């Protein structure tokens, strides 16, 4: 029996962070299953394949001198409200609650089913900031469903916002992500261990500390460190690698 086709709107950050990666992969897979999927982001998410049937809907960041900066939350809310009507969306699913949950609630109130997925620092760090906590809590309380990527995060969301989150762990596609010796040889010599870190290099990711840990590993066995991503801690990580004498083995 053919499943019902849904018109789904997903909201995400487009960069290298985990929440954007999960959202882009989910959008692509849902679209390939036959649903009409629209991914809202300020630019095309880097993990959304060029050939994906999911459609990127750009969110503009208009700037007016009267404001201190671009009003992302309002722009996203306006884009969601306008495009949901035009596209006939059945549901909107946001990834990373701040400010996506509040923007979706501002756009629809309780007039359209909203699902919010919590990814980590949107609860533990950013979401606890007094500037964001109240609006985020109200948006989560009004949602049709809230999910979290781990039991620990669901428990933290309960303490922080008083919401019950369903645990839906991030998935791994074993057909795509499996040991490939020929790929490892692109980065490491025969007999070397290859360590990989992937993130958006924000301070909470502690990338310089990863380099420090790697320097200790290098003293005990041959290894290389592959850092995938970019962000504010990139230069500091490079500096630490040079200071500890492991820069030739850090890429």
For each of these PLM feature ranges, what is it?
Residues 1-6, 180-194, 220:
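Nucleotide-sugar donor-binding and catalytic loop/hinge architecture
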Residues 10-17, 23, 28-74, 231:
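N-terminal strand-loop element at the rim of the active site
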Residues 11, 147, 188-214, 226:
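Conserved donor-binding/catalytic core segment of Leloir-type glycosyltransferases
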Residues 73, 91-111, 118:
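An aromatic- and histidine-rich active-site surface loop
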Residues 89, 107, 112-130, 142-145:
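A short, histidine- and acid-enriched strand-loop-helix "catalytic/donor-clamping" loop
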Residues 126-127, 172-186:
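Acidic anion/phosphate-binding donor-loop and adjacent secondary structure
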């Amino acid at each position: 029996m053919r499943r019902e086709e849904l018109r789904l709107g997903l909201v995400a950050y487009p960069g290298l962070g985990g929440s954007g990666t999960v959202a882009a992969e989910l959008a692509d897979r849902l679209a390939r299953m036959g649903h009409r999927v629209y991914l809202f982001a300020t630019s095309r998410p880097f993990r959304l394949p060029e050939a994906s049937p999911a459609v990127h809907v750009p969110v503009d960041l208009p700037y007016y001198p009267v404001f201190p900066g671009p009003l992302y939350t309002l722009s996203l809310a306006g884009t969601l409200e306008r495009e949901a009507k035009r596209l006939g969306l059945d549901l909107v699913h946001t990834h990373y609650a701040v400010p996506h949950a509040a923007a979706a609630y501002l756009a629809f109130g309780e007039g359209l089913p909203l699902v919010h997925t919590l990814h980590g620092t949107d609860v533990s760090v950013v979401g606890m900031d007094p500037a964001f906590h109240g609006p985020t809590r109200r948006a989560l309380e009004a949602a049709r469903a809230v999910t979290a990527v781990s039991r620990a995060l669901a428990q933290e969301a309960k303490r922080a916002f008083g919401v019950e989150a369903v645990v839906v762990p991030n998935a791994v596609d074993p057909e795509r992500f499996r040991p490939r010796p020929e790929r490892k040889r692109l980065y490491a010599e025969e007999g070397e261990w290859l360590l990989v870190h992937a993130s958006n290099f924000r301070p909470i990711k502690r990338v310089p500390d990863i380099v420090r840990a790697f320097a200790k590993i290098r003293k005990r066995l041959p290894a290389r460190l592959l850092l995938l991503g970019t962000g504010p801690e990139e230069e500091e990580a490079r500096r630490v690698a040079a200071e500890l004498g492991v820069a030739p083995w850090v890429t």
